[in-house]
Amino acid sequence: IPSSNDMGRPTLEGGRSVHPLMRDEKVAELLENEGQRRITRAYTEEAVRFITRNRDRRFLLYLPHTAMHVPLFPHTDFAGKSNNGTYGDWVEEVDWSVGRVLETLRQLKLDRNTLVLFTSDNGPWASKGKAGGVAGPLRGSKGCTLEGGVRVPTIAWWPGTARPGTSHDGIAGT
């Protein structure tokens, strides 16, 4: 999807709001809202294929999920899996996705030679209530310069190099 998943465009065929799912520079499929339920899985499987195809050479995989951005459309396999409603269900699905990518790296014996960074770009969308996420004890949200709007996690995974359980208080940008 070339834009945020809340920015669908009307089609010429009836004015429905759709989201173009791209493969390289071509539209592979036009997704209506409910079609977004398949997108995390589609991105994940494409990432696994990419890793497998490129396992014998250096690669950079950039996997920017549209998940956890309103409107919320977790796959039906994850419906009701969390105690935090639809937003939490989509968090569960992204957790599955990251696990699938990490497992692929392990199976191909690439895990000790691959740095994986997991991060976010902003805090929750306060105007959407719980459906937009929560910043916990931090004040502020998306579009705000308070900590709740700009402080996001960054997790580094690199077995044998990045020591588990360590943390750093340095500043980074996404």
Describe the function of each predicted region:
Residues 1-59, 65-74, 156, 164:
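Formylglycine-dependent
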Residues 14-15, 19-29, 99-108, 127, ...:
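Substrate-binding rim/cap in mid-to-C-terminal beta-strand-loop elements of soluble/periplasmic
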